[in-house]
Every structure is written in structure tokens, then in C-alpha cells.
Regions:
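Single-pass alpha-helical membrane anchors
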Residues: 2-13
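Surface-exposed, glycine-biased beta-strand/turn segments
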Residues: 15, 20-88, 95, 117-118, ...
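Acidic, glycine-rich catalytic/binding loops that coordinate metals and/or anionic ligands
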Residues: 23-31, 37, 62, 111-120, ...
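Short acidic, gly/pro-rich beta-turn/loop elements at beta-sheet edges
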Residues: 48, 102, 109, 167-169
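Zn2+-dependent peptidoglycan hydrolase active-site motif and core
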Residues: 54-56, 71-112, 128-157
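Glycine-centered loop/turn positions within well-structured domains
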Residues: 67, 99, 166
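Short glycine-/small-residue motifs
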Residues: 124
Length: 179
């Protein structure tokens, strides 16, 4: 039973240089140990809340309040505060990517300018009254997500905790939609 919906929004702002030979897939971690269900994918969707955008710039992962959130990648914390539309938000950036963790607990584990490594605990899933998703229509009367998202991750996510194999927003969107 999930007591809360973590809305994990990944804003993909790639700054990868054209001559880079490094692969990204070995540098990324899944953000929630034991929680792999994606209830809402990157891209266009039916908005789960009235007035919200139909374009979703990240993925939603349901997890219980207090669940540890792990850094997807190594980098520097560039934002740790209240963010419009994202509730309490932490942003981690490196030379390749910028990742936003939205709707986290207001009791931040990291601060702006901290350096983090992939897999490090940076936050916890926040209480729903912090960011106003009370009466959120993500679940039906049986507690199941209502947006038709798959209950298993695409093959690019199945290598234990390894995550993300694309190098562009289009590949990222495609990978998330594969079943």
C-alpha cells in the first residue's frame, strides 16, 4: 500500500558535448530502492490534476512517505527549496545533466552547493499535505494507479539499480514508454 505519491520529475537538460565517448548508463542510479513502478511517464499525458500541464517533464514514482530518495547521478546541489509547481525540490547538476527531485520532504538531507554521489541519500518522500496532492486522483478505490502505466520497467531499467541509457530527450522519452 502506498501512502503517498512521490512525483519525481526529471528535467532533462543535456549539455553533453558531441565528442564525448563516455557512456551515461554506468553513471546513473534508480532513485528509490524497491520502488520501480512509474505511474506517469515523461511526455504528453492526461493531466492527473485539474489545471496542470498535459506535458509532463519527468516521471512519477509512488512510494511511502519517508522513503529515502537516492541521487540519480553525481553532481552539485544547485537548488534545495520550495519550487513553484514542484513543491519542495532538490536539483542536482553535473556537466551532463540536470535532475530535479520534486515534492520531497521539507527536511532536506542535502543543501545548496553540496556535492553528492550517485546512490547517496539526498531526501525523503514528503507528506502529501506539504505539496497539496490531497485527494490526488492517481489511485482508484482499490489503491491502484489509474493512468494505465505499466507495472514493470522497460528493459533499459532492468539492470539492477542501473538507469538511463539514452543521450537525448527523445531517446529518454522513448525508453520510458517501452514495455
Amino acid at each position: 500500500y502506498f501512502s503517498i505519491m512521490l512525483i519525481f520529475i526529471i528535467l532533462v537538460f543535456f549539455l553533453i558535448t558531441q565528442n564525448s565517448n563516455a557512456t551515461l548508463e554506468d553513471n546513473f542510479m534508480w532513485p528509490l530502492d524497491g520502488y520501480t513502478y512509474i505511474s506517469s511517464y515523461f511526455g504528453y499525458r492526461n493531466s492527473p490534476t485539474s489545471g496542470a500541464s498535459t506535458y509532463h517533464s519527468g516521471i512519477d514514482i509512488p512510494a511511502p512517505e519517508g522513503t529515502n530518495i537516492l541521487a540519480v547521478c553525481s553532481g552539485t546541489v544547485t537548488f534545495a527549496s520550495w519550487g513553484a509547481g514542484g513543491g519542495y525540490t532538490i536539483v542536482v547538476e553535473n556537466d551532463d545533466i540536470k535532475v530535479s527531485y520534486c515534492h520531497v520532504s521539507p527536511n532536506f538531507i542535502v543543501s545548496k552547493y553540496d556535492t553528492v554521489v550517485a546512490g547517496q541519500i539526498i531526501a525523503n518522500v514528503g507528506p502529501k499535505n506539504v505539496y497539496g496532492i490531497i485527494n490526488n486522483p492517481y489511485k482508484d478505490s482499490l489503491g491502484k494507479p489509474t493512468n494505465g502505466a505499466t507495472t514493470r520497467l522497460p528493459f533499459t531499467f532492468n539492470n539492477k539499480k542501473r538507469w538511463f541509457s539514452g543521450k537525448s530527450a527523445k531517446l529518454f522519452q522513448y525508453a520510458l514508454k517501452q514495455k
